[in-house]
């Protein structure tokens, strides 16, 4: 007899519309400007959670990454998600309430600058799938602008907020388009951050690099460089990507 809610969902996932069904939870995203996508899944599956005790997701959107980290981390780990856009924050809260980890995840509908100034806790793991489009050409949808464009949260401001909120030996992890990841790492270095891990990502062998996963720290140390192809040459998911997503995607 299955008594654990997470295990029950894993064995019998409920397929629903308006979102994305994972093995142990469902993410509704019909009220969010940015939908569940590969970038968020990559970050949530990859970030180092082994030594984390308190986690912050900046710009948490639907709550996807916070939920993935909750599934991967120890039961005592507490997770805060900060989201500026009201509809997304409300949907993230609903997703959390329906998940097996409702007591561990707390969603704050707030500007991250105010949160960084007033929040009493520091975090040993901070994650973000940040905006990356320049604000020269805006969307017609204000919520989508907030999610996609750096006008609401520049990368410089993001790094400053993370510095205020991170513990002395904490890790700050982001996912970005590859060229912007290079620029983000350069900017971080100017502000006293050190790159501790960099994963260069391409869709398949021989294709251009298109995404980057970065782990930053305020402490100097060895930098680990890795590569990941999401698919093999014939188009099927690569074994490395399957290993990352196997605890989350159905049929893997």
Curated annotation (Swiss-Prot):
Pfam families the UniProt entry points to: MTS
Signal sequence extent: none
EC nos: 2.1.1.223
Annotated Gene Ontology cellular component terms: cytoplasm
UniProt KW keywords: Cytoplasm, Methyltransferase, S-adenosyl-L-methionine, Transferase, tRNA processing
This protein's record includes keyword Methyltransferase: yes
Keyword Cytoplasm attributed: yes
GO molecular function per UniProt: nucleic acid binding; tRNA (adenine-N6)-methyltransferase activity
Single GO biological process annotation from the record: methylation
Gene3D superfamilies linked: Vaccinia Virus protein VP39
CDD domains, sorted: AdoMet_MTases
PROSITE patterns documented for this protein: N6_MTASE (PS00092)
Source domain of life: Bacteria
Enzymatic class: transferase
Catalysed conversion reaction: adenosine(37) in tRNA1(Val) + S-adenosyl-L-methionine = N(6)-methyladenosine(37) in tRNA1(Val) + S-adenosyl-L-homocysteine + H(+)
Record's subcellular location: Cytoplasm
Purpose: Specifically methylates the adenine in position 37 of tRNA(1)(Val) (anticodon cmo5UAC).
Family: Belongs to the methyltransferase superfamily. tRNA (adenine-N(6)-)-methyltransferase family.
NCBIfam families named among the record's database cross-references: tRm6a37MtseTrmN
PANTHER family the record matches: TRNA1(VAL) (ADENINE(37)-N6)-METHYLTRANSFERASE
HAMAP family cross-referenced by the UniProt entry: tRNA_methyltr_YfiC
Full protein name: tRNA1(Val) (adenine(37)-N6)-methyltransferase
